[in-house]
Regions:
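Membrane-proximal soluble regions of multi-pass membrane proteins
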Residues: 9-22, 78-109
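Residue-level signature of transmembrane alpha-helical entry/exit and packing/kink sites
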Residues: 32, 57-61
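Structural signal for membrane-spanning alpha-helices in multi-pass inner-membrane proteins
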Residues: 46-49, 72, 101
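Short, Lys/Arg-enriched N-terminal segments with co-localized hydrophobic residues
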Residues: 1-8
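Transmembrane alpha-helical segments that form the membrane-embedded catalytic/substrate-channel core
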Residues: 63-79
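Short, amphipathic, aromatic/basic-enriched membrane-interface segments that mark the entry/exit
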Residues: 24-35
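Helix-coil boundary and interhelical linker segments in multi-pass alpha-helical membrane proteins
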Residues: 47-58
């Protein structure tokens, strides 16, 4: 496997500048599809957590969300997830991209 590990050395100081970089790390629609699936499952599990306060649902939501996304990065995009360098903004970016997919701004199939 060939990976591109963080060729972008810029440090982002705001989300507005970060988001185009985030999208560039998600250029393959299969990666976006995997993110969409993982985030959909994670949202369902977040809801289950808040209904039951069972911490296992919170753990499962993180595993689903990051698991699907990281499969896309490591095996489809062949890059390092932005989460490793920008965990908070990547989390926000994933949910923004999710909403944009629902709005039809990104193709996933």
């Amino acid at each position: 496997l060939y990976f591109t590990w963080g060729t972008n050395m810029e440090r982002y100081t705001n989300f507005k500048d970060f988001y185009p970089y985030y999208l560039s790390e998600h250029s393959n629609k299969t990666t976006k599809l995997l993110h969409f699936i993982g985030t959909t499952i994670a949202i369902y599990l977040y809801i289950r957590f808040f209904m039951t306060f069972d911490l296992m649902y919170l753990l499962y939501s993180l595993l689903a969300g990051y698991g699907f996304a990281w499969i896309g990065h490591f095996f489809v995009e062949k890059n390092k997830p932005a989460t490793f360098k920008y965990p908070f903004w990547s989390f926000i970016g994933d949910h923004k991209m999710y909403l944009e997919i629902l709005q039809g701004k990104h193709k996933i199939i």
